[in-house]
Amino acid sequence: MIKLFNSLTNKKEPFVPIEEGKVKMYCCGPTVYNYIHIGNARPPIVYDMVRRYLTYRGYDVTFVSNFTDVDDKIIRAANELGEEVAAVAERFIKAYYADTCALNVKEADLHPRVTETMDDIIAFIADLEKKGFAYEAGGDVYFRTRKFNGYGKLSGQALDDLQSGARIEVDERKEDPLDFVLWKAAKPNEISWSSPWGEGRPGWHIECSAMIKKSLGDTIDIHAGGKDLTFPHHENEIAQSEALTGKKLANYWMHNGFVNINNEKMSKSLGNFVLAHDIIQQYSPEVVRFFMLTAHYRTPINFSDELLKGAEAGLERLKNTVANLQHRLAETADMGAEEEWLEKIAGAKQRFIEEMDDDFNSANAISVLFDLAKEANIYMSEAQTSKKVLNAFLELFAEFGEVLGVSFTQQEEELLDAEIEALIEERNVARKERNFARADEIRDLLKEKNIVLEDTPQGVRWKRGS
């Protein structure tokens, strides 16, 4: 049974969906005013992995992730660029798709946008007002925080301990400093929508509540996002939604850890960020994804060239093992199954599932992958091998790769087996003709491609280096 760490209860719990066999999952998406940095890329990667694993375990997952396409930051960016808000948002939505697609993140089943959900947001606020949870003041609408019993249950903060200021917006029009905005009155020359309270636009927190309700209903199974969203964003989502419906917003809350540079959170505000589209030019996107999954999703992960190079080398070892399995399969005679090895492979699959069942522990699951590669290399060192065993290894690597969203097969730019064989044959001919310069040239070329040649009495054998 899958167990996941529920931020709401601060403990691991067995995962029991609302409807058997089905999962409704929402992940807070980006505010589209700039390109995403590597820290922004972690939530899409880790929750894509969670989604893939739930699917692997037989669940029918409906995955929703939003775009905040109107916001103070987008308006500011549009003014600086001399463009319309919609044009800026659209450009960075396309950039987000490009980056996440490169990182092999599957598209959400739904990608709602704030600007396309405006009627639902306004209706949501109006219903809160009718129930006495919201009030209008000077064209703005605020949520009565103290009226909601249970505020602070996600972040573990008591109302009396919260101080106005810092992360609480201070406004003399509020009945209470802890009240937060649901609707903002329009400012001159700023994009706005008509509402019962006049021209304006929604506050950040209400947007997700309305989009969840519209796309997934009153209560969902899993709500996910970065740790930094726990308070006030997710806390306020709970207050708004549960005040309106009287039902739990989400049964399970998941929060991923930060990506740090020099042990400090990467963020645009601190200026210590690396853009995703820059780093995937320097390293392959699957190396970046693999790197992200080498740490448990709840722990912080330090970002550095050294660690990325380590992930790159590790992924290359796994790919070479798979390539050697494929090569060995092509030259292996069909033999009977070897039960001992098939049992070892089945055991690896069981360990992988156990690790992933334990709060989606991709770090430990990847350790199982390296153990599997070690066993595969030991098996391939034997004089005789079985097609059934080799296929079992390959099938399991493919299964694990689908869950992690990382392919362990060779890329197109790598030499194909047939190309290697052709070069070896050309080298053999060159040696027979005593053209040793050409023979050495081919050996060096293969070495550059990480192909190791071994001259034996039976002829030349080759393998991909580890």
Swiss-Prot record:
The modification Phosphoserine is found at S269. GO terms for biological process: cysteinyl-tRNA aminoacylation. It catalyses: tRNA(Cys) + L-cysteine + ATP = L-cysteinyl-tRNA(Cys) + AMP + diphosphate. Zn(2+) binds at C28, C208, H233, E237. Its main location: cytoplasm. ATP binds at K268. Coiled coil: none annotated. Keywords: Aminoacyl-tRNA synthetase, ATP-binding, Cytoplasm, Ligase, Metal-binding, Nucleotide-binding, Phosphoprotein, Protein biosynthesis, Zinc. A motif ('HIGH' region) lies at residues 30-40. Its cofactor is Zn(2+). It comes from the Bacteria. It is an enzyme of class 6 (ligase). Monomer. HAMAP family: Cys_tRNA_synth. This is Cysteine--tRNA ligase.
